[in-house]
Amino acid sequence: GRHHCDRSPSEISNTKKKMSVIKIADNGGHAITMTSFDGYHIASFSPPEILCEIFNNIPHIKFRHDDVFVCAPLKSGTHWTWEIVSMLLNGKAEIIHKSKMTQMLEAVPTEIIDGVPSPRVLNSHLHLCRLPREALEKKCKIVLILRDPRDVAVSLYHHCKGVLKHDYDGMFENFLPLFLEGKLMYNNYLDYVVEWE
């Protein structure tokens, strides 16, 4: 069922965890490939050993007072919002020639994020309890995006079918229960929303 954080970020950060590639089968027997970190499922951005190092270092990321932090559940418009915020900070409505992935907490090593010049537009799909406390303590600007969960489910379904590393070829009616039960990447959508209330 539902998976939420039952531990504080300091408890999470003080325990080195391991990652593994898992397959979760839908009601029709079709499996989706993803990575699991202490029961928390994420997309397989990198091999598990690299993702494990990234995740173990997330609580130690140093935020800056001029950072803008875009937070959103998966498939909620993070990329578009990241582009718009980046354009606003650049003072120009021009295409950003770098990927939001280069500033995504759970996708790249801490050294890469640390090397981004200010002002940074960082982003993440992680639940609030898995984010560095410093993001809130430094009082950097946070942009929270919430999208109708019905739209998120449809978009995530097409994403899983379209991205080869997920290796998914199931039907939506079999996919939807996995979404509703929080068994997909970033676990439960409603838990994400409730944590931000």
Task: Set out the residue ranges of the language-model regions.
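PAPS-dependent sulfotransferase catalytic domain
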Residues: 9-197
